[in-house]
From Swiss-Prot:
Organism superkingdom: Bacteria
Pathway: Purine metabolism; AMP biosynthesis via de novo pathway; AMP from IMP: step 1/2
Keyword Ligase appears in the UniProt entry: yes
Origin species: Pseudomonas fluorescens (strain ATCC BAA-477 / NRRL B-23932 / Pf-5)
GO molecular function, one term: GTP binding
Protein name: Adenylosuccinate synthetase
Keywords: Cytoplasm, GTP-binding, Ligase, Magnesium, Metal-binding, Nucleotide-binding, Purine biosynthesis
Signal sequence extent: none
Localization terms from the record: Cytoplasm
Amino acid sequence: MGKNVVVLGTQWGDEGKGKIVDLLTEHAAAVVRYQGGHNAGHTLVIDGEKTVLHLIPSGVLREGVQCLIGNGVVVAPDALMREIVKLEEKGVPVRERLRISPSCPLILSYHVALDQAREKARGEQKIGTTGRGIGPAYEDKVARRGLRIGDLFHRERFAAKLGELLDYHNFVLVNYYKEPAIDFQKTLDECMEYAELLKPMMLDVTAELHQLRRAGKDIMFEGAQGSLLDIDHGTYPYVTSSNTTAGGIATGSGVGPMYLDYILGITKAYTTRVGSGPFPTELFDDIGAFLAKRGHEFGATTGRARRCGWFDAVILRRAIDVNSISGLCLTKLDVLDGLETINICVGYKNQDGAVIDAPTDADSYIGLEPVYEQMPGWSESTLGAKTLEELPAAAQAYIKRIEELVGAPIDIISTGPDRNETIVLRHPFA
């Protein structure tokens, strides 16, 4: 029998999911994206060559792996085609390997215009979105007025729906935000061009996944962003617009929870966050700058500098519960090399002095102070280590303490950006 393995982020995104998905797809027949859009940025390094993916699943660089985009993903046709062409220029036969659900909501120019106009209007109170139209596209979906990829192949029906949508959204853009209107004919013509390009890649992804499952094939489910950015379970309102936690798999792919065999939670050996929102362990000192520089902490999608802080066991415990995590993958351990002491956040202290667990909304984080447990660092290099025994004793103790604090095993340790710089203690597909 095949196994269905999930890879998802347990922090605020940017945990290193792309590398791990790429590593594990050696065993998979298919990789499926089930939520988010091209706001994701998954970086792969193979033999020193770097590839950044936004919409296309991270298995695309492996021959014989089918890459699927499930119905829960919002698709910007222009961004998708740019990504396809860029990979094809490197010799990757993307159109042979990629199939897309016609039920995916479309991100069009008016979604991008709305997203950017809102962030501009919020000023200092902005959420910190990527400005790529993700939120407005999900809003249209939930309001049951959105256009889907499948609509592209019925020109008259598409044109009628597009006209109604532009009447609605242009009214807001022009009258409320004082921004220019989106042109109907230009948008329609562009969409019809994309229709021709996308049609050969259409597939009932849900049916395909169940066919693969019944045939005993291994399937990888690739999450985007991180658990603390989940629309329901994250630090609301500083969240994304989809369910980044395990619940999003069933709704975004059509594969129910009973069929999921192993859920791998990816966590950095420290913590980062992009954009606005609470971050209890954030560092504003030289160590924060050290982590950012050593870890190359700049967003793969936006290029924005990431905020850096100590490892937070509190948010990880919440993520483990919410996702039913089977095991963890600890990434970027090598970034901590050379630090004399390392702190782990074990709780939050409120203004009354009581130690509490993770709050459920952003406002409740105000006034909380992290409670730290200090551990010795290590001077030796962990970069490229392939076995646990190669790691310094202090690094092994750090890993063991994290396991104790969060109540989940660390099954994989990443010791560098390349797919081969990895220690696998328990393989998810085993």
